[in-house]
Every structure is written in C-alpha cells, then in structure tokens.
C-alpha cells in the first residue's frame, strides 16, 4: 500500500506521517493468522530460539577474547530468542556511547545491532525471528566484532554520532 502522500511532489510526499495510516492495525490480525497457517507459531518460536542460541554460541566467544569476564551475564528472565551478551567494559557507558557503537556498526560493518546500556555497562541484544538465518550472525562475527575490538583497543567509548 502506497503512502497517502505518494502523489505529492518532493519533499511534501515525505511529510505524511505513516503512523496516521491504520493499514497496519487492519492487516495485523491477517498477518498473524497467515503465519500460523503457513508455518505455525511454535515452529517460528523454535526456529528463533535455536537460531539465537547458535548466534550466542558464536558471538559470545568472540566477545570474550576482548574481555576478562564471561559475555553471557546472568539475567532474571532470559528470553530464548533474545539472549543478552555483555560488551567489553568502557565501550558503552551511556546513551551517547550506545548510539556511537550502533552507528559505527552500521557504517563500518553494515550491520544493525541492538545495543543497550544498563548501569554504565554495555550489552548486545541478539534478536532472532522467522526471517533470520545463521549467516546473519556469522556476518556479525566477521564484520561487527572487529569494530567492537577496535573500540575496545582504543578505549574510546564516544565517537561522533551521525
């Protein structure tokens, strides 16, 4: 479905707020039902959990080469499809350094990553869904870990945000 502003000239066509379009609300129940019909939600959940476990099994050891503590922290309510991994100390300490790492991973490694900070410690949130494949996480190890390693070596937690 095209945007309500698709027929407008540039730049006006981009002034339309997609949040005012209720198409998502109208179609969500059909999408949910179709995924159940095609694959089944249990199969999707199992795939996501298995894939996230695989991702953690290859990303955690790579992160552990950069730090003296385990990359897998104890969490109260672990989510099978979204494991949390500890980043090396000092890389992400606040919102600015969180955005800096996220931006560097995007610009230099061409990956999008869930980076968060809690009590001055940075974490990587692995997220897996039906559309993800093992190669997504293998590419993160290949391209994303060197960016994190570079930041760990430099000790700099801040870089210019884009």
Locate each region found by the language model:
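Pyridoxal 5′-phosphate
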Residues: 1-162
């Amino acid at each position: 479905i095209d945007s309500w502003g698709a027929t407008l000239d540039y730049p006006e066509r981009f002034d339309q707020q997609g949040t005012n379009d209720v198409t998502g609300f109208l179609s969500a129940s059909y999408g949910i039902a179709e995924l159940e019909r095609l694959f089944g939600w249990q199969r999707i959940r199992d795939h996501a959990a298995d894939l996230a476990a695989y991702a953690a099994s290859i990303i955690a050891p790579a992160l552990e080469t950069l730090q003296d503590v385990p990359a897998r922290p104890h969490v109260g309510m672990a989510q099978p499809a979204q494991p949390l991994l500890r980043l090396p100390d000092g890389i992400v300490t606040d919102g600015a350094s969180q955005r800096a790492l996220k931006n560097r991973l995007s610009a230099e490694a061409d990956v999008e990553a869930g980076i968060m900070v809690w009590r001055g410690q940075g974490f990587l949130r692995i997220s897996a869904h039906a559309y993800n494949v093992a190669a997504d996480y293998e590419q993160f190890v290949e391209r994303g870990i060197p960016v994190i390693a570079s930041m760990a070596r430099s000790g700099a937690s801040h870089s210019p945000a884009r």
